[in-house]
Amino acid sequence: MTDSIMQNYNQLREQVINGDRRFQHKDGHLCFEGVDLDALARQYPTPFYVFSEPEIIRNIHEIQQAFAAHKNTKTFFASKTCSVMGVLKAIRDAGICAEANSQYEVRKCLEIGFRGDQIVFNGVVKKPADLEYAIANDLYLINVDSLYELEHIDAISRKLKKVANVCVRVEPNVPSATHAELVTAFHAKSGLDLEQAEETCRRILAMPYVHLRGLHMHVGDQVPESEPFAKATKVLVDESRRLEEVLGIKFDLINVGGGIPVPYKYDDENGDPLKDNMYAGITAQDFADAVIREVHKWRTDVEICIEPGRKVTGSAAVLLTEVSCEKRKTNYDLNGNVECHVEWKFVDAGYSVLSDSQHFDWFFYVYNASRMTAAHDAWIKLAGPLCDGGDYFHMGVKGEEFLLPKETHVGDIVAFLDAGAYTIESQTVYNNRPRTGVVMIDKNGDTRLIRREDSYEDMVKYDIY
């Protein structure tokens, strides 16, 4: 069993460097869009993230092509996925819009060049100041999450004498086979009950400055099958059709949210996406087909809004971290008998840098970028630098064990693949370790720093003492 796992992992490593559009190898090193990652890691302090603008563009084109059968589709990048300004700029330059979940996310999108009418505002808590900022800046949509919020929108729009364009977010009551904390359409905190949709729409229609555009939902994140998207879209379509009839209106759009998965495990023949959603299970085309099929049973002229995040940036980044310490330890049973010996490799990135590895037990392919063409044939445990017993990487190739070359030593650079979604956004400064820098590989293959590592001065400048 162990031999077959090792063989499979090394076959995948060969596929990564010889058949993946993102990766290559040179002088034994892993290259990302032609950039030698071992050499790059000597230019900047590790750990840091490396983004690929070409991969962002490819992912956006894949989504757009998937919706080619419905030309009237508008794509809003879920900026909570990664709101580094250089990444937002690449996404803006690629020609799509943005979705935000806080006033500061809205402000960042505006500052990088998105117009107000290219931004959708989501969230379960939008304070009056947030709503006033959104309405004042003429956002494309505010997705209303509660009647309480709606009353604030009404009052603020009257005060400003400005139109507030809104959708009503409803919960379609459709579960999905993803991580429990990523389900947002079944027993979730977001949205109104479907039964409240009519009352909410009637209230909006009586508000002088609030313009009702349609209904909104979001099924979940990293959903590995198309059926929940089809079911939830049908719920939204059926309710939209009914509301148009009973209210005598015509909706401008239907917003189906995001949730297109990214493959974190590539060996599809060995996994079941419904049991392990690290396998993507479906493509952007499958998502689009499920949505369009249901929408077209209602109308073909209505605008479809989508809010992908992970699908845009997930595969577009790697995390580079240096092997900074190593040791061999012995595990004993309670009677003092030797159970096994464990080879530990310590890298300078812990769960403060890559929190999903612990909080969601997320799987990432981990390779020695300095020795990428060498067989990864040694079982090791991989840990971070934090003063915390839980700061080690739990989701290995076999249980908690990872594979690296036997000759892996201190100073080697380790790469975590597919690290572009919900990673930088969730970093902390636990142990007063700095948040990482970010490097961008642009369309020409040139690299530039788009976010520097935190300095000591950054750590203390907010304290008052």
From Swiss-Prot:
- Highest rank taxon of the organism: Bacteria
What does the record give as EC number?
4.1.1.116
User: What biological processes does GO assign it?
Assistant: lysine biosynthetic process via diaminopimelate
Cited Pfam families:
Orn_Arg_deC_N, Orn_DAP_Arg_deC
Describe the pH profile of activity. Optimum pH is 6.5-8.
- Which residue spans adopt a coiled-coil conformation according to this UniProt entry? none
Give the family from UniProt: Belongs to the Orn/Lys/Arg decarboxylase class-II family.
Protein's recorded name: D-ornithine/D-lysine decarboxylase
Q: Tell me the gene name.
A: dokD
